[in-house]
Amino acid sequence: MKRMVYLVACLPFWLTSCEEKVTALHFNEAEQVFEIGKESELRFLNETFEIKDKNMEAQTLLTDAGKEIPADEVRIKLVKDIEISGEWTPIKFPVREFDGNGHTITFDGIRVVIEESSKGVFDVGLFEEMGGEKEAVVKDLTLAGDMTIDAQKREDGYSLLAGSLAGEFKNGCIENCTSKVDISFADNKGICTLCPGGLVGDLDSYGSEVEVALRGKIINEGNLTVNPCSDAYIGGVIGRATNYGKIFIKENVCVENKGDLTVQWKADAQPDHSYIGGVVGLFKTNETDIEHLHNWGNIRLDTQNTSATFNIGGVCGELTPHNYERIYPLDLYNAGNIEIKHDLLAEFSAIGGVIGSFGGSSFHQVVNEGKIIVSGKGCKYISGLLGSESSIHGNCYLYSCCVDKVGAYPVWNISYHPVTKQVPCKENHPTNQK
């Protein structure tokens, strides 16, 4: 009987230890996709990348029939929910398509460690980066659980792009993806240039003719915690969206954040500009329409009485075009509170219920229902909708369909462009707000 109990108790260990090593992935010939349903198969993507000496052009993926598929043709489809645990190295292998197929990848307390002896720029997420010269598509995927980024051993300055999906997404499309991942970051020194988002750290296009599109429901429900910080672009969904190409967020799309952002600044940080937004930290793009960005998460910032300049908005910390082109925001909504602990000492810090710093835009249906709570000394650029007008990005128009439902501050601050004004709206706008 004792021997029987011992065998039963050890069975899970034996099953795990005897699991066959992955040497190839099953390839569905009918659909022309690799099928993945195990953690070991996800990790195999990195093992393959390392074997190929990290030469991106030489990357291929081996099928279970012995055929090599070039990386720019690799399409992956999840066939089961997957749970990842322990230390995680973000996937470096470039894929053309990653189809979640309605499944969930759960991070079970995973840790990503930033080592002292390693490089100076890091991309952290399920993937390190996606897209590039060849576009990537990610669709119908849910990410859940929690991820800790540990940089406490680091002594030298470095840059970090982080999101549950990818640190960087350069070119392609993200469609119907949800993150429920709680992300926490700590380095104890505040020596990092930090760009975290709930889903993607940095959303960028590879060149002026390249497009990045968000489609369907793009949702973050995870909380983001940063401590300490000294130079940052922080967003509930995307940390930074900036390019010289086009980012399409319009029509049949809704980008939503429902997670809280909690940020503590480094007390002796340099007086640099930093950006915090409920949906996007910094949004800087060429002429385009931007539609249906919604935030329900709270933003909590402890300034530690630093002299840093903050641009903070319930939806975007800053929203401006590149150069002197124009952008056309429609249906930007905030219901989350912005809570500032300690003083805002920098003269040009800007806080808006929806957007912190703005310029070169025509605003329709910008709505705020969240409170701005400043416990210490405030700044002169605090507004119910739009914090402060940028001095270098042309005039703006705020249409009458825009409203601050709290009413504790002026709707916006304008001082640079004499033709910037509020104007009547005659449109009958649809809305994706719940």
Provide a role label for each language-model segment.
Residues K2-V8:
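Sec-dependent signal peptide recognition
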Residues L11-P12:
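Repetitive helical segments and hydrophobic/amphipathic motifs
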Residues L15-S17:
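C-terminal motif of bacterial Sec signal peptides marking the signal peptidase cleavage site
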Residues E19-K434:
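Surface-exposed repetitive/solenoidal architectures
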